[in-house]
């Protein structure tokens, strides 16, 4: 990583909830709504967007902690905006405040921490696990 991001730097992801983003265990008339795992996926990618311009070739990021409150349901067809704001950066570890809104209200708030890693070193460690 060239330099750590500045506190206040943001990343954003926008999407429209599709059927593939809806809970898959709905039955008995349960409406199709955005499921929490997909919401977290978009929130994590918003955080990554804040860091991408600072990565060197061969760098990537991995999530190390996430804490999300899914506050409100969002139906299929609604637009969602996920935003991550840097609240702390120390070395390769970066912490974010998360928030997501649909067209009507805040649907999620939380905290995420990621770490910038060297892909080659990460792959080597993984290979050792595979070879056991």
Regions found by a protein language model. Name each.
Residues 30, 34-38, 95, 117:
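Residues at secondary-structure transition points
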């Amino acid at each position: 990583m060239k330099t750590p991001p500045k506190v206040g730097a943001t990343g954003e992801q926008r999407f429209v909830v599709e059927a593939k983003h809806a809970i898959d265990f709905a039955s008995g008339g349960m409406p199709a709504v955005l499921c929490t795992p997909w919401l977290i996926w978009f929130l994590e990618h918003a955080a990554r967007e804040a860091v991408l311009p600072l990565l060197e070739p061969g760098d990537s990021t991995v999530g190390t902690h996430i804490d999300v409150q899914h506050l409100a349901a969002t139906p299929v067809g609604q637009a969602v905006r996920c935003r991550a704001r840097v609240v702390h950066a120390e070395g390769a570890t970066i912490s974010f405040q998360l928030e997501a809104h649909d067209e009507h209200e805040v649907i999620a708030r939380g905290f995420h921490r990621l770490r910038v890693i060297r892909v080659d070193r990460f792959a080597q460690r993984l290979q050792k696990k595979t070879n056991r």
